Amino acid sequence: MPIQILAARLANQIAAGEVVERPASVVKELIENSLDAGATKIEIDIEKGGAKCIRVKDNGAGVCQEQLTLALSRHATSKISHLDDLEAIVSLGFRGEALASVSSVSRLTFTSKPADQEQAWQAIAEGRDMQVTIQPAAHPQGTTVEVLDLFFNTPARRRFLKTEKTEFQHIDELIRRIALSRFEITFVLKHNHKIVHQYRATQTQSQQEKRLASICSESFVSSALYFQNSDNALKISGWVSDKLSARSSNDVQYCYINGRVIRDKLINHAIKQVYAYSLPQGKFPAYVIYIECDPDQVDVNVHPSKHEVRFHQARWVHDFIVSTLTVTLNESPLSASEPQSQPKPSEHAYLPANRGEEKTDSQYEPKEKNKSAGRVNEQTAAPSSGYAKRETNPQLDQAKMAAYCDFVAEAHLPFSADEQQSSTLSDLTFATVVCLIDRQYLLIKLNAKQQLLNIDSPFLVLSLENVDLMIKQMELFAAWSDGEVIAQPLLLPVRVELDALLLKTSEDFNELFMRLGFVFKIQGSKLIISKVPALLRQAPVAKIIPELLTFLSQTDNNMDAQQVNLFCVFLVNTLKQQQAENINWTEQSAKALFDLLLSLFSEKLSDWQKQLFRVPDLSLLVQGFSHE
């Protein structure tokens, strides 16, 4: 058969196979056109599940008489005009295929009136010959598109339609998804001339929650955690369910990018990673997530349905979602989400948000740890090493801490320890946090019974950076000592080229790495790392691994606890050196870190005084008033 150009009718019907899958596909395309036209009210009237009639009416900008015929032509659109426009698409539609594809498999009537046009006009097209007839009509400002007898000229496609009830359920779900993305727009859905749903435009937060409840259920709204976060040009907000609100189906999972309904594998993977070990088998999280980014950072021209997107910085987006949702779930006390069957600990302690549940048996196989959840009202940006309130076994923590302090007392710590007067620090449980200094230090006021011996000052300055490093060392050592591994999978495995000596070292110390949360394999001359400890999740793993192996190559294979502790010190110090900048602590995270320090270290604080605390010289402040 010779090569030939397809007839317009045949080409449009082929395109319709991609664009028009079922009646819900038609409704989606028509509503997106209405939204792009600036409509504030959209009415959707369905008959017989959409097989008989689909009518979408809006009060948008409308189409002038001269462009009605062009509007039904293939590859005709007002939304893009140049190739560069594809790099920054802001409209929902842009292909110019929808109306032509729909009219090729139905009897379509397009009626429209712009505000500056006195008369409304109507375009009529049928799938048989694709000829468009223009005639005057009566219509208010806006557009009405009526699609009759869908697939009337393609019997095979019509036979594949499901029952009327099933097809309408798909349309109903579509309207729900779109209504959650545009709270400022009124949607009215009718089926067989009866109003099924009416979502009125919302102006206040309470009205938004009312629409959210009508779509996602009252139970979701009552237990959902609201969050919002931003990182440069990337913003994320929405609602997520806590652990107790897990559902038996994934029917409440909505995600939007720049107002577009999407089902993206990258985002699904990020959300699953957050909830992976927080939910029981067969349970699903519920969420409504809104992501906003620069249009040139996301490619929506991936699939005709436009449900799939491609991010230019996929790793950044993935990790931003994971960190934001993890902090959200960890912001509230675990008591709001612990199963009732579990015994309640007698005391509260603070643990890093990345810590997992305590284990009594020793297991070397790394696995991701549980995430705590609870009710929060708002989330702000927090350091990557944020801390959250947790309930733990205080006896177990004290036992770990005592053993850890005994080993670390003789270790060569990476902290500066300027010579100053020797003194002893008593219990700081009732000390008062005064303020945060330069987002790096915490000013603490002691009461009369908590003074430093031989030092006449009621104030201390705490180095948050040093406390953070010290606690990370404790976390690593605890993971090694009792098999409580904190491992997180990398989005993409990291490949590191190593020489023969370092490859041999990685084999010799494989058990140590596993107990600390590393998972890797050797492939030729490369080490392929798939999981790392939680504290290395955002670190440059490819730079850190060779340094760790170089350190281990100079030690004995049979490492005792003292040597393992020194390795943990070296690992944390290396991590600090590889960080581009210091953490900017917030008052909330700094206070949580201080409380964590007290709960874990208790009477051992005097052993760490030179590394953690400094006594401010108040005489310098006094001299400032003397004008000398």
UniProtKB/Swiss-Prot annotation:
Task: Please indicate if the UniProt record lists DNA repair as a keyword.
Answer: yes
Listed A to Z, the keywords are: DNA damage, DNA repair
| Comp. bias intervals (Basic and acidic residues) | 355-371
Single Gene Ontology MF annotation: ATP-dependent DNA damage sensor activity
Q: Which GO terms describe its biological process?
A: mismatch repair
Skewed-composition ranges (Polar residues): 333-344
Q: Which CDD domains match?
A: HATPase_MutL-MLH-PMS-like, MutL_Trans_MutL
User: Which region ranges are annotated with the description Disordered?
Assistant: 333-390
Q: Does the keyword DNA repair apply?
A: yes
Show the GO cellular component annotation of the record. Answer: mismatch repair complex
Extract the InterPro entries matched here. Answer: DNA_mismatch_repair_CS, DNA_mismatch_repair_MutL, DNA_mismatch_S5_2-like, HATPase_C_sf, MutL/Mlh/PMS, MutL/Mlh/Pms-like, MutL_C, MutL_C_dimsub
Which family does this protein fall into?
Belongs to the DNA mismatch repair MutL/HexB family.
Q: Which PANTHER family does the protein's record reference?
A: DNA MISMATCH REPAIR PROTEIN MLH, PMS, MUTL, DNA MISMATCH REPAIR PROTEIN MLH1
The function of this protein is: This protein is involved in the repair of mismatches in DNA. It is required for dam-dependent methyl-directed DNA mismatch repair. May act as a 'molecular matchmaker', a protein that promotes the formation of a stable complex between two or more DNA-binding proteins in an ATP-dependent manner without itself being part of a final effector complex.
The name of this protein is: DNA mismatch repair protein MutL
Where does this protein come from, organism-wise? Answer: Psychromonas ingrahamii (strain DSM 17664 / CCUG 51855 / 37)
Q: Which gene encodes it?
A: mutL
